[in-house]
Amino acid sequence: MDETLRKRLESARLYLCTDARADRGDLAEFLDAALAGGVDIVQLRDKTLDARDELAALEVVREACDRHGALLAVNDRADIAHAVNADVLHLGQRDLPVRYARAILGDRPLIGRSTNAAELSAAADREEGVDYFCIGPVWATPTKPGRPAAGLDEVARVAALHPQRPWFAIGGINEDNLDQVLAAGARRAVVVRAITEAEDPRAAAAELKRRLVAAAAA
């Protein structure tokens, strides 16, 4: 395991998931703004892309992350993560098993897991080859249609487990409800629309990051 990546993960607070913004054509500019605001990890998550277009978009994300010292995450695809030398591969509960992802990627990249219940979070915290996990969706969100909300109680249950690995709350989190997530015990968050739909992505990211850092230091 790359210890530098592990340390960067441990210090990360704000994780952004974005699509390729093909309808706006501003992916590079958007990423520069969000990363300047304090985003630590960027995951490209765009189910509309074929592999070639995803690789092209990831080149843009890679360059932006390198400019700002952020981690690049790939969703689901170990082969694509390998192709772009991603820092992070994020796997859902029904995606490629971790042992197979490690066989493709080796030890360097970080691997994350999605969970929607404290019991699954506890299992991910113990799973060999996993470096972090997410719990959610905290609130129902259009980015996960049909997925029932785990709720703040589930975030609190995970926090009470005192996981050994870094973990993030995810799902419907924004400036208006972040304080509830922090009160439940989370100290890291994954956001989508809170930044992707913001009029000022840099300012939105900066405010979220400020509150996450303050909570972690308290």
From Swiss-Prot:
2-[(2R,5Z)-2-carboxy-4-methylthiazol-5(2H)-ylidene]ethyl phosphate binds at residues 141-143, 172. InterPro entries: Aldolase_TIM (IPR013785), ThiamineP_synth_sf (IPR036206), ThiamineP_synth_TenI (IPR022998), TMP_synthase (IPR034291). It catalyses: 2-[(2R,5Z)-2-carboxy-4-methylthiazol-5(2H)-ylidene]ethyl phosphate + 4-amino-2-methyl-5-(diphosphooxymethyl)pyrimidine + 2 H(+) = thiamine phosphate + CO2 + diphosphate; 2-(2-carboxy-4-methylthiazol-5-yl)ethyl phosphate + 4-amino-2-methyl-5-(diphosphooxymethyl)pyrimidine + 2 H(+) = thiamine phosphate + CO2 + diphosphate; 4-methyl-5-(2-phosphooxyethyl)-thiazole + 4-amino-2-methyl-5-(diphosphooxymethyl)pyrimidine + H(+) = thiamine phosphate + diphosphate. Mg(2+) binds at residues 76, 95. Its EC number is 2.5.1.3. It holds the Pfam family TMP-TENI. One of its GO terms (molecular function) is thiamine-phosphate diphosphorylase activity. Coiled coil: none annotated. One of its GO terms (cellular component) is cytoplasm. Pathway: Cofactor biosynthesis; thiamine diphosphate biosynthesis; thiamine phosphate from 4-amino-2-methyl-5-diphosphomethylpyrimidine and 4-methyl-5-(2-phosphoethyl)-thiazole: step 1/1. Its cofactor is Mg(2+). Keywords: Magnesium, Metal-binding, Thiamine biosynthesis, Transferase. The keyword Membrane does not apply. Binds 1 Mg(2+) ion per subunit. The keyword Coiled coil does not apply. Belongs to the thiamine-phosphate synthase family. Condenses 4-methyl-5-(beta-hydroxyethyl)thiazole monophosphate (THZ-P) and 2-methyl-4-amino-5-hydroxymethyl pyrimidine pyrophosphate (HMP-PP) to form thiamine monophosphate (TMP). This is Thiamine-phosphate synthase. The lineage of its organism: Bacteria, Bacillati, Actinomycetota, Actinomycetes, Streptosporangiales.
